[in-house]
Each structure stands twice: as structure tokens, then as C-alpha cells.
Design a protein with these regions (language model features):
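Short, aromatic/basic amphipathic alpha-helical patches
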Residues: 70-73, 165-169, 244-252
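Short glycine-/acidic-enriched loop or helix-start segments at secondary-structure transitions
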Residues: 30-31, 66-68, 97-98, 226, ...
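Non-catalytic pre-domain segments flanking phosphatase-related domains
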Residues: 1-23, 31, 39-49, 288
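Mg2+-dependent phosphoryl-transfer enzymes with acidic/Ser/Thr/Gly-rich catalytic loops
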Residues: 14, 190, 197-288
Length: 288
């Protein structure tokens, strides 16, 4: 993550708030208007200087795929600056160093790797058998094999994961250490102790920011862990969010935007986050 075209800004004198954004279909709209991205960065610059707000991306993308996405988001935008943190694959943490480069959160990532190596060593045979059964049972399902993500899959239709997830749960339910992370048409097996929620808690603790000063933006099933794990945080989702996410937002301190994706983030800042935290701020917009 250190080779991004732009770097994070110097830290504010006082770190007061932490805003965490899911990437795909929340913060980033593929092919979306460049003006929306520019509005976001101008607004975050203002919040940083006036209210000590840090921000980051909390995603299921792997580091390489996120780097590509961030490069698209930064392209041709003079206001763009890198996030203060990223969480990739729902579990691997990178934090901006003094020079604004995103560097691995060594202790957390090392412990995470050990936990997953142990998990997949002990249960790899069972998971291999399960994935073979899923591949033969469900059309349009593909297995994804990567060195850092050995047990994951993708389906043609995100809604098809409902039935797939039920079959998976019947098999892995008795194994408390094994959970699944689901985002759109993607699903991966992982260790229960490492998810968007526990990763975000680690990030907040490193910055010394209490969970009551955290805002979580997300649209997918894997965002539920963050909202559950930090119940005092403010929650926000765009209109395209999964129904389970909307239900979670409605049950806590939160705001469901009537706008989708990036527009939903900008609307959520203006009509959700700012009033909740008492920020006398506005989204620096023209027309969105």
C-alpha cells in the first residue's frame, strides 16, 4: 500500500474522530462522476483541519486490488490525499506513517497471519471438501485460490449467496473459530477474531480515538461486524445497502441515506454525521 500516487496528510494536532468507509459501492462508485470524489476530498480536508477527523478504507479487497481502486479514485484530482488507514480482506491493517505512506500494522497483521495459518492447517481438509461440494452443487459459483486467501468463492448473482451461505453454515456451524465474510458476490472463510470490527477497533486504539467518536459507512454484509463490534459508533449506509445493513443502522445511532454509493456517503455526512457529532460543517458541494 506504500506505493500510492498520493500520500496521507500530516496528522491534525488533536486526533478527535475516525471515519471508516467501505470502498466498493459505498465510498467508491465505479465510473461515477469525478466531481463526487472531489467533493469528498475537499470535505475531508475541511473536517481534518477543523475537527481533527482521520479517515480510512475498511474493505474486503486485497491490498493490490485496493491500491488499483484508490489510484482510480485519486486520478486527476488535485484535492485527493491517501487515507490514514486501510483494512484489506476485512483483516489486514495498514497505517499511515510520518511521511504519509501506508505501512503494515506489524503486530496485528502478524498475529492475524498466524491465526489463519493455524485455522486452515487444522480445518483445511474439511474446507476443501466443502468447497468442492459447493462447486458441484451450484452453477455460476467459482472458487478463488490465492496464496493469501486460499478459501474464497464468487457467484454470478449476489443473491445466490443466500442459499450458498445456508449450506456453508450447516457444515461450519459447529466450528466456532470459522466464520464467513460476505461482500456482494464474494465470500471468504476466515478466523472469527479478525474482521472489519476487530480491525477497526485496533486502528481506533492506535490513534487513541474512542468508539463513540467513530463513524462507520458501509453497504455489505461484511460491514455488519464493524457495526456490531463498535456499538457506540455512528452508523451510516447508502440506499443500495443490503437490507440487513439497513436494519442494523436503524437499530443504533445511525442514518440511512436515500442516495446510493458515493452520493449516499456525502449525504450521510451532511445529514447524519455532522448533526450527530454537533459539527458546524457542510459538504463542500456544487450540485450532487
Amino acid at each position: 500500500m506504500r506505493f500510492l500516487p498520493v500520500r496521507a496528510l500530516p496528522k491534525p494536532e488533536r486526533l478527535r474522530y475516525l471515519f471508516s468507509f467501505d470502498f466498493d459501492d459505498t465510498l467508491f462508485t465505479l465510473g461515477g462522476p469525478a466531481e463526487e470524489r472531489s467533493i469528498f476530498f475537499r470535505t475531508m480536508r475541511m473536517l481534518r483541519s477543523q475537527y481533527g477527523v482521520l479517515w480510512g478504507v475498511n474493505t474486503g479487497r486485497d491490498p493490490v486490488y485496493l491500491r488499483e481502486g484508490l489510484a482510480d479514485m485519486f486520478r486527476d484530482d488535485a484535492e485527493a490525499f491517501a487515507p490514514d488507514f486501510t483494512v484489506t480482506m476485512e483483516r489486514n491493517v495498514h497505517l499511515a506513517d510520518a511521511e504519509g505512506r501506508l505501512m503494515p500494522g506489524a503486530a496485528w497483521n502478524d498475529d492475524c497471519a498466524v491465526a489463519h495459518d493455524s485455522l486452515f492447517t487444522r480445518y483445511g481438509g474439511m474446507l476443501e471438501s466443502l468447497m468442492g461440494q459447493l462447486e458441484s452443487r451450484f452453477s455460476g459459483l467459482g472458487l478463488r485460490r490465492q496464496g493469501n486467501d486460499a478459501f474464497s468463492l464468487v457467484v454470478d448473482d449476489a443473491y445466490g449467496l443466500d442459499e450458498v451461505s445456508c449450506v456453508i453454515q450447516d457444515t461450519v456451524g459447529p466450528y466456532e473459530e470459522i466464520v464467513t465474510q460476505r461482500a456482494g458476490p464474494y465470500l471468504r472463510f476466515s478466523h472469527r477474531d479478525y474482521n472489519k470490527g476487530t480491525s477497526l477497533s485496533f486502528v481506533a486504539s492506535r490513534f487513541g480515538i474512542p468508539s463513540s467518536h467513530v463513524a462507520i459507512f458501509g453497504d455489505g454484509h461484511n460491514d455488519l461486524d464493524a457495526m456490531r463490534h463498535l456499538p457506540e459508533a455512528f452508523r451510516c449506509c447508502p440506499s443500495n445497502a443490503a437490507q440487513e445493513v439497513k436494519d442494523m443502522v436503524a437499530r443504533g445511532h445511525g442514518y440511512i441515506s436515500p442516495e446510493p454509493r458515493t452520493r449516499g456517503v456525502l449525504d450521510g455526512l451532511a445529514h447524519g454525521v455532522f448533526p450527530y457529532f454537533g459539527m458546524k460543517a457542510e459538504v463542500l458541494k456544487e450540485d450532487i
